[in-house]
Amino acid sequence: MRFFIDTANLEDIKKAYKLGVLAGVTTNPSLVAKEGVKFEDRIAEICQAVPKVESVSAEVTPDAVTAEEMIAQAEELIKINGGDKNVTIKLPMTLAGLEACRYLTEKGVKTNVTLIFTVNQALLAARAGATYVSPFLGRLDDISEDGVLLVAKIAELFDVHQLDTQIIAASVRHPDHVTRVAMAGAHIATIPYKVIEQLAMHPLTDQGIEKFAADWAKAPKL
């Protein structure tokens, strides 16, 4: 399973990129709005900051309701950073989103269909040609449903029908989500920087480092 970072914060993206574990970036209108920057400018900055990732998801804005409006926005977004091949168009899981997905896929544009909450939605998106689908774990957990089970069902379905669409586990809130979706068959987990930090931490690791440092301080030095 690969790691994307789910943020529009440039500093967090740069920190994650330096770790050598980052395969992509996902953004959405809410994340960009929180940064208080122009959407297109931030996507360009992200592309420049992480040139070796496979995907930077740029989502069409909520005022694009029809397939035609989504496609028009997508055509502008893929021009960002000189037509950067890493820009992936993120589309909502609606009928219009599916129509736009099919059109963009036929043009060779990578797509990420987001706000997936059922297996049937994932199957429709895959059949429309989506490069990625993004099932949301945390939001399902909030209504007492099992987001990890959804990922497992989608993974099984894609395997049975030999679908190439990749699963991005989204709305990931803690390390246990990451462990469980990796075991469930997600290709990618897109996570906030704070979860990346949590994945790297364990109190016994800290204690071990402190013990090594204390013992080394006592060792004879040449």
From Swiss-Prot:
The record's subcellular locations are: Cytoplasm
The record, for Pfam families, names:
TAL_FSA
Presence of the UniProt keyword Transferase in the record: yes
Instruction: Please name the InterPro entries in this protein's record.
Output: Aldolase_TIM, TAL/FSA, Transaldolase_3B, Transaldolase_3B/F6P_aldolase, Transaldolase_AS, TSA/FSA_arc/bac
Instruction: Please state the Enzyme Commission number of this protein.
Output: 2.2.1.2
Source domain of life = Bacteria
- Please name the PROSITE patterns in this protein's record: TRANSALDOLASE_1, TRANSALDOLASE_2
Q: What is its main location?
A: cytoplasm
Sorted alphabetically, which keywords does the UniProt record give? Cytoplasm, Pentose shunt, Schiff base, Transferase
Function of the protein: Transaldolase is important for the balance of metabolites in the pentose-phosphate pathway.
PANTHER family in UniProt: TRANSALDOLASE
The family annotation for this protein states:
Belongs to the transaldolase family. Type 3B subfamily.
Name of the protein in question: Probable transaldolase 2
Q: Which organism is it from?
A: Bacillus cereus (strain ATCC 14579 / DSM 31 / CCUG 7414 / JCM 2152 / NBRC 15305 / NCIMB 9373 / NCTC 2599 / NRRL B-3711)
Organism placement in taxonomy = Bacteria, Bacillati, Bacillota, Bacilli, Bacillales
